[in-house]
Amino acid sequence: MNEAATKWFTDNFDTVKYCVTDYHELLNKEDIDAIYCALPHNLHGKVYSDIINAGKHLLGEKPFGIDAEANAEILKACKNHPEAIVRCASEFPYYPACQELIRWIKDGKFGKIIEVRSGFKHCSDMDPEKPINWKRMIEINGEYGCMGDLGIHAEHVPFRMGWTPKNVYAKLSNLITERPDGKGGRVPCLTWDNATLVCDTEDKDGSVFPVTYEMKRISPGSTNEWYLEVYGLEASAKFNSNDPNGFVYTDSWGKEQAWCRINVGY
């Protein structure tokens, strides 16, 4: 526990009611209904399960477990406590322009879908001298590397639209295999930096189309870039967080199409 960081909160916010060094103390307090928990992935299985089993609502950070075994433990707690609200979400789909794209999906404006592309990309790890941190360590982050951290952002809308993968082909890259340890030495960096997944999925009409997911920590020029693109025979549309007010679309007619852009406000 970082006592200096904790003291900053207690010194600057008189609304802080409890300050504890053992999270079990929070679980035993009857006046606490919900807990927001952000911890390294290797702690998710036990701590998340303890929160749910204590009857508290949980707002958790992805990926809900360092591996399948830890995730199964959390899901078991959820099943045993259906009264507990357990949530994790990506904020990006709630831009008004992206909400417009989602409405188009729900309204069936795209017709027969050709393909969907969704991704979340960073560029901060392009610096090979950036010191290693826990998200680059398999024993703390997990073997899935960037997919566990960035995956929910790319998968949020497609999964909510019912486009779950029927199969998965993955191209995974570990581009920088060692980093400074912050103490003058160098250590192995074994997690996946970039992942591209190509999946078949099925639309509600039974037609099958490909979905491509990009999850990248090393993507030149991408500063927290999130995007969603849907291509169909009757219409296509795109959203990119680099242009958060822009809803880009085209209606398909004949052999030629033109991309249009409109501002979507709140």
Task: Locate each region found by the language model.
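Predominantly a Rossmann-like dinucleotide-binding segment in NAD(P)-dependent oxidoreductases
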Residues: 84, 92-189
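Beta-strand-loop-alpha-helix segment that lines the small-molecule cofactor/substrate pocket
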Residues: 33-34, 40-41, 45-93, 108
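Conserved SAM-binding strand-loop segment of SAM-dependent methyltransferases
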Residues: 16-22
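Short, Asp-centered acidic motifs that coordinate Mg2+ and/or phosphate
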Residues: 18, 34, 115
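Short polybasic amphipathic segments
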Residues: 228, 244-260, 264
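Contiguous beta-strand/loop segments that form the cofactor/metal-binding neighborhood of enzyme cores
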Residues: 155-248
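N-terminal Rossmann-like dinucleotide-binding module
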Residues: 1-14
